Each structure stands twice: as C-alpha cells, then as structure tokens.
Amino acid sequence: MKTIIVFLSLLVLATKFGDANEGVNQEQMKEVIQNEFREDFLNEMAPMSLLQQLEAIESTLLEKEADRNSRQKRCNGENVPCGPNHSTCCSGLSCEETFGYGWWYDTPFCVKPSKG
C-alpha cells in the first residue's frame, strides 16, 4: 500500500512539473521557426537547389547513355528481300530488282551495287 502511495505521489508531481517543460519547448519552437526564415537558412537552401539541378542533368545524361547503348535496328544482308514491307539493306548494299530469283518472289533484293 505504501508503494502505491509513493508511485501516485510521483505521478502527481510528474504531471504538475511536466507542464513547465512544455512552455520551454514552445519557446524553442518559436526560435526554430524564426531561424528558418533568416539568411542562413536561405543560404542552406541554395546548395539544395543546385543539387536538384545536378540530379536533373545527371538523369538526362543517363537517358542519353541508355539510348546510345540500345540495340540498333537490324539491316538486311546480301540476297535478302528488301522494299517497303521489309527492313533496309546494310551499308554497302543496295535494294535492286534482280534477274535471278527476284522475279519469282516479286520483290527487290539487297545486292552489292553493280560497278557498270
């Protein structure tokens, strides 16, 4: 019973004097709010905006790098059908009508350009 009385009295004292710290906390909060709008705080914000700008630049560079590493479109090799319904011929080849099998398939083929 005596221990309960001691704990209850401590509880009452803690609640009574615990409110005194609340006023101190409110004063500290007011100081923090006032300090936020000073020049020091604005000077701290400038590097943050610079950091955000650098991150934006970095993201665009990474996108360009990802595009550069992407796979190129495939091209047709020699003796492969070409034309409007097919992909383009590789470099060094031209899309021409041939006498051989071109007439059978009714489409031009990728061939080496004739030198004549």
Swiss-Prot record:
Compartments, record wording: Secreted
Disulfide bonds: C75-C90, C82-C95, C89-C110
GO molecular function, one term: toxin activity
Keyword Acyltransferase recorded: no
A cellular component annotation (GO) from this entry: extracellular region
Alphabetized UniProt keyword annotations: Cleavage on pair of basic residues, Disulfide bond, Glycoprotein, Ion channel impairing toxin, Knottin, Secreted, Signal, Toxin
Residues with glycosylation annotation: N85
Entries under Pfam families matching the protein: Toxin_22
Primary location recorded for the protein, binned into one broad class: secreted
UniProt key word Secreted: yes
Signal peptide: 1-20
Propeptide: 21-74
UniProt note: domains: The presence of a 'disulfide through disulfide knot' structurally defines this protein as a knottin.
Family under the similarity heading: Belongs to the neurotoxin 14 (magi-1) family. 06 (ICK-Trit) subfamily.
Job description of the protein: Ion channel inhibitor.
Record protein name field: U16-barytoxin-Tl1f
Lineage of the species this protein comes from: Eukaryota, Metazoa, Ecdysozoa, Arthropoda, Chelicerata
